[in-house]
Amino acid sequence: MASPSSFTYYCPPSSSPVWSEPLYSLRPEHARERLQDDSVETVTSIEQAKVEEKIQEVFSSYKFNHLVPRLVLQREKHFHYLKRGLRQLTDAYECLDASRPWLCYWILHSLELLDEPIPQIVATDVCQFLELCQSPEGGFGGGPGQYPHLAPTYAAVNALCIIGTEEAYDIINREKLLQYLYSLKQPDGSFLMHVGGEVDVRSAYCAASVASLTNIITPDLFEGTAEWIARCQNWEGGIGGVPGMEAHGGYTFCGLAALVILKRERSLNLKSLLQWVTSRQMRFEGGFQGRCNKLVDGCYSFWQAGLLPLLHRALHAQGDPALSMSHWMFHQQALQEYILMCCQCPAGGLLDKPGKSRDFYHTCYCLSGLSIAQHFGSGAMLHDVVLGVPENALQPTHPVYNIGPDKVIQATTYFLQKPVPGFEELKDETSAEPATD
């Protein structure tokens, strides 16, 4: 995990001030931010115009129905939606049979952001289920008896760290997990997602995340990884899945977060990356797109906005005098407005954009992005601003791991008390060698 500095990620819960300014998206001049296609229609411009029209309807309806606009996060409805999902899912989720640890993580993290306690019986049931997903070869599969894969391994470790009990921590077979990571490591520093699978930046991040949380990083496990990730940064400034590919929000987050863990952020052109990610916030909608010329999507409220705390800290460490000491480098108010007005399902749960269905994935990442937009800095530089009613305030999330900062500290403290698997044996063997003249 990255070493602490004067600018840290930990934002303790506080009495957050409430935004008193008029809503950004309800200003009379806001319509000027809509797409101007210069009378040259394309497939993408037509789709963008359709989305903007739907969002304009939401903005107009809100303005018409609220004489004094006060945005409200429907906490109770979201809580009940999440609570039901932990116990029972409809057959619509059959397609996610290989993503069951993800469902645990998405729901548990959403609950911790809402500051909803996880009952002990539920925590125990989740632990027992995830133990069934752990492979004898190391790592976790998408369900009991499935092949291990780095994506559900990341989700399972995060879920267990959110639960944060000794019972949860001890489910993770650290020795086998380290062996599994070595089996995926490639000569160029990259990692396979699973044995015989594809290589991309996600796997490097998932490996770095679980290894750093559980204290199994060895001197050579990530040899060459930072250099490989740096080759994935392209001319746009963002990061693609592999070298030479188009920059994408999800891959960019994974790449930068992995480098933060490895303390190699300076391997990237940070100013170019900053320009790319800030250009992904949509002028009219207020949310983020994942790639250039794509539509807004609520999940990028985290994948893109979550990059800004990482960049802020990296640039702060370089002594950049232009950095704000009270706000991230994106329009925090506009993002909060998009999530609260456009991404909440009336029945509970959050979604991609108006017209889309709710799901646990978007619920998790919309709430994560909302938390990022509410909380800035820590200590003397703590500056929290919550849009709408005070009850909208969420718990902070760690932008590297996307679980509570306190859960990161708790997990790393626990696992740092244990030796890195194999390291002590190697040290003992070395010390047992006879001295030479």
UniProtKB/Swiss-Prot annotation:
Pfam families xrefs: Prenyltrans
InterPro entries hit by this protein: FTB, PGGT1B-like, Prenyltrans, Terpenoid_cyclase/PrenylTrfase
The protein's required cofactors: Zn(2+)
Residues with PTM Phosphothreonine: T436
Keyword Zinc: yes
Cofactor note: Binds 1 zinc ion per subunit.
Chain residues that bind Zn(2+): D297, C299, H362
GO molecular function annotation: acetyltransferase activator activity; enzyme binding; peptide binding; protein farnesyltransferase activity; zinc ion binding
Impact when changing G249V: Reduced catalytic efficiency
PFTB repeats: 123-164, 174-215, 222-263, 270-312, 332-374
Positions of (2E,6E)-farnesyl diphosphate binding: H248, G249, G250, Y251, R291, C292, N293, K294, Y300, S301, F302, W303
Substitution effect: G349S: Reduced catalytic efficiency
Reaction catalyzed: L-cysteinyl-[protein] + (2E,6E)-farnesyl diphosphate = S-(2E,6E)-farnesyl-L-cysteinyl-[protein] + diphosphate
Family to which the UniProt record says this protein belongs: Belongs to the protein prenyltransferase subunit beta family.
Role noted for this protein: Essential subunit of the farnesyltransferase complex. Catalyzes the transfer of a farnesyl moiety from farnesyl diphosphate to a cysteine at the fourth position from the C-terminus of several proteins having the C-terminal sequence Cys-aliphatic-aliphatic-X.
Name of the protein this chain belongs to: Protein farnesyltransferase subunit beta
Name of the gene encoding the protein in the UniProt record: FNTB
